[in-house]
C-alpha cells in the first residue's frame, strides 16, 4: 500500500510509506532554502515519489494532517453561495488567495462553489494527479502527532500514556491519549486557551526573536539565569491534577494577510517585553522555562498515575524542549520515554501516513524507529562532477571516517556530508559540522566563525552508544538528541566544548547499526584521544535550513571558517591547509 502524507503550512513536508515501511520523509525548506517554509511542499512530494519509484497515480492513499481544511471552506464559503467574493474582510481575502494558490479555477467554480462539495476535497488536487481509487484521509492534527510517536515507539504489549503538546492545531493545543494493542484512544483534549506552546512562543517574541522558530535560543539562555516564581503569572494557562484550572485568552494569534500567508503574532509579547527588561534576559528565560516544566508536569504526572503506566510517549513542538524531557525522565516515574524525534509540525506528514496505514491494517505490528535518514543522497559520481565543474582541488579517500577523525584530533573544523539527509531539525551525523570537544574555546570558535550565532547557545556531543554511561548520569539509549542529561562530573573538564553552563548536554548516542560511517569516526577519534565523543552541530549557518545538496554544502564551507569538507569519499581543504 502506497501512502503519501502531506503537511501544508509552516514546516511543510511530505512523507511516503510503502507497505508500512518509511521510504522518505523530508521538509520543503531543504529544497527552497526558506527556513520553516510554509509553501506547498511540491519538491518534497516529488522527492518522495522518486524515492519510492512510483508516480502520484500509483498512490493508494493521500493522508492530510488536519481536519481544519473542511472547516475553513465552510467558514469562508456559504454553500451554495460563497461569502468570500462579497466580503472585504482582510482575513477572508487572504484565505482566498491561499486557496487560489493550490486550486485551479475550474475546481473552485465547479466544486467548492457548489452544494455538492465533497467533505474530503483536498487542497492538493491541483498539483497532484491522483487515481480515482486513491483514498483521502484527513487526520486531526494532534492525532497525527500521536501517530507519529506511537507507531515508531516499538512499544508492544504494554499500555502507554501519550501526550501531544504544541501551539495549536485544529483548535487543540494539548491532548492526552492511551496507546494499547496498537490502537490510539483519545482521553482528553485542551483548546487554544490552554496552550503552553503559545506562551513559550510569546516569550520568544518578547525577547526579539521569531516565535515558532527561535524557541531554542530561550531554552539555551535559561540556565544562565535564576527563575523568578510568580513573575509571569497571568500570561499562561494553569493546570492542576491533569486538568485545566485557569484559561488564558491569547486573542487572535494569527491572520491571513494580503499575500495569502498566515501571519502569527502574540499580543502578550508587548507586555512580556517589559518584563524582559525588568527581570533581565537570563532571569526571564529561566522563569519561562520553569513555567513550561511546572505546567507540563501538572498535566502529565497525574495522567501517568491515572493510567497506571510507566511508559510515556510524546510528540508536538513542546517536546523539542530537551530540558523538559530531562526533568520528566529524572522523576523516576518512567521505564520508557519515547519522544518522536521529528516532533514539530514537519513530522505530522509521516504521522498522518502512519495513521492511515494502521487504520487500514490494525493487526500489523509497527517497528521501532532506528534512524531518521530518509532524505536525498548523492553518489560519488554526482559529487565528483560538481567538484570538477567548480574547478576545486580535491582528493578521494577510501576511509573518510579515519581521515575525519585525524582532522578533528588536529582541532580542525570538519564539514561532514554523507549518505541520506536526516529528517527533522537535528543533524545526526549525515549533514553535520564536527569539531573536537576537548577544548572549551571550540564552542566560541564555532558560534562566532562558523554558525554566526549567539554565544550562549550550546553544542551537542555525539558518543558511541557503548560509552554513554561513562559520560552521562542516568542515561537512556537516545539516538536523536531529544533529551539532555547531566554530564558525569569528572568528564566535564575533559569535553568542555559540549557541556552547557548547567553541566548538561544533549547527546546523540550513535550505534554502528544506525550509522556505521559516523560510528567509526567517533570510535577512531576515541582511540586517538581516549574520549569517545565528538562535537556535532548542524551543517548550516544561523537562519538557514540544514544543507541538502552538495552545492549548498560547498557554499556553506567557503562562506564560513570551516577547514575541511568531506562529502562522501571526497575531501576538500581550505587553501591554508593545502601543502
Residue ranges and their predicted role:
Residues 55-123, 147-148:
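Short beta-strand-loop/turn "lid" adjacent to the catalytic site in phosphate-handling enzymes
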Residues 286-312:
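Phosphate/ATP-binding catalytic cores across multiple sugar-kinase/actin-like superfamilies
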